[in-house]
Amino acid sequence: MKKNVVFFCTCIILTGCTPAPKVNTVAEAEVIRNLEIQWTVANQTKDIAKVMTFFSPESVQMVPDKAILVGLKSIQEDFILSFADTTMLWDTFSWTNDKVEVSASGDLAYISGTNRIKIKTPNGIVDYVGKGVDIWKKIDGEWKCVVGIWNSDKQ
């Protein structure tokens, strides 16, 4: 009996010591890049339903010159207003992925990049150039943007 107890305790200990499977961070980084590309296309086409699929319910967005947006409702309201703004030529919007880092655990990542969009002004069309960072979290097996912040370069 004593041998059985020792055997089972050893099995339990060894099972607990089994390392978690190694995450392929390169593949996960590629997933994040592809999500950012899909998000760019959704912005270009003003597809609000698609845009909203990229955010987690508690997502925080730090938009230039506005109060911090928290949660899907406030983020969606902001995108609706932005897409309705006829001075913003959304079909010209672009995002360039500069750097992607995925945590070793594979559940958190960030991406930095640059964005461009043409804007109508009283003096003609100007290029808005900016930069930003999105933080992604894997929730129930899916990557969702939990924090985004961006601003413009000096124009």
Predicted regions and their residues:
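Beta-strand elements of well-folded, non-transmembrane domains
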Residues: 117-121, 136
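A solvent-exposed, acidic/Ser-Thr-rich amphipathic alpha-helical stretch
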Residues: 26, 30, 48-107, 112-114, ...
